[in-house]
Amino acid sequence: MNLFRFLGDLSHLLAIILLLLKIWKSRSCAGISGKSQVLFAVVFTARYLDLFTNYISLYNTCMKVVYIACSFTTVWLIYSKFKATYDGNHDTFRVEFLVVPTAILAFLVNHDFTPLEILWTFSIYLESVAILPQLFMVSKTGEAETITSHYLFALGVYRTLYLFNWIWRYHFEGFFDLIAIVAGLVQTVLYCDFFYLYITKVLKGKKLSLPA
């Protein structure tokens, strides 16, 4: 494992921890898109169905378990534990416009036409756009809490570091995964506007807001 992947994993884990702490400490999921979190739960479930059949390392297995457990815990907190604080009126993105196209694309463009490989590919495609409901929600409300902004920034850093991970692997290992790279580029592009606002506003102590 190279440094970029390790730092990317840490950034991803930090994002998840920030989100869970935000919800638990405030006893509220206001400003959090439940739809994005459901999509992430679907992403990790589809990607890690090989948990009991494909052992790579203890680190890899532990990270898979953590991602799945945390994603479903987040969904439970939003839709059950703190359901009364969930802002469904602003979380209105039509997720079927994300799930259906990525599922079809996974059937058409994949590395191997097997159930696990198609599900893995689907998870890669879906993850690249899973944050859209959250960004759409921030756009509708006009602003985001600072901790939510930190969560989104950490997710963006995770994807950016993973792009460097692919570059590193291609240069030093000759490994090239076009599906993962293109999906990673799409996801990183979606964060570009947010990165700019985060640096120019949040880091200066202001609240983050997106153009409505």
Curated annotation (Swiss-Prot):
Changing S209A: Inhibits coatomer/ARF-GAP recruitment, receptor redistribution, and intracellular retention of KDEL ligands. It is a multi-pass membrane protein. The keyword Lipoprotein does not apply. The record marks R5, E117 as: Interaction with the K-D-E-L motif on target proteins. PROSITE patterns: ER_LUMEN_RECEPTOR_1, ER_LUMEN_RECEPTOR_2. The modification Phosphoserine is found at S209. Residues 1-4, 53-58, 111-116, 169-178 are lumenal. Phosphorylation by PKA at Ser-209 is required for endoplasmic reticulum retention function. One of its GO terms (biological process) is protein retention in ER lumen. PANTHER family: ER LUMEN PROTEIN RETAINING RECEPTOR. Belongs to the ERD2 family. This is ER lumen protein-retaining receptor 1. It comes from Homo sapiens (Human). The gene is KDELR1.
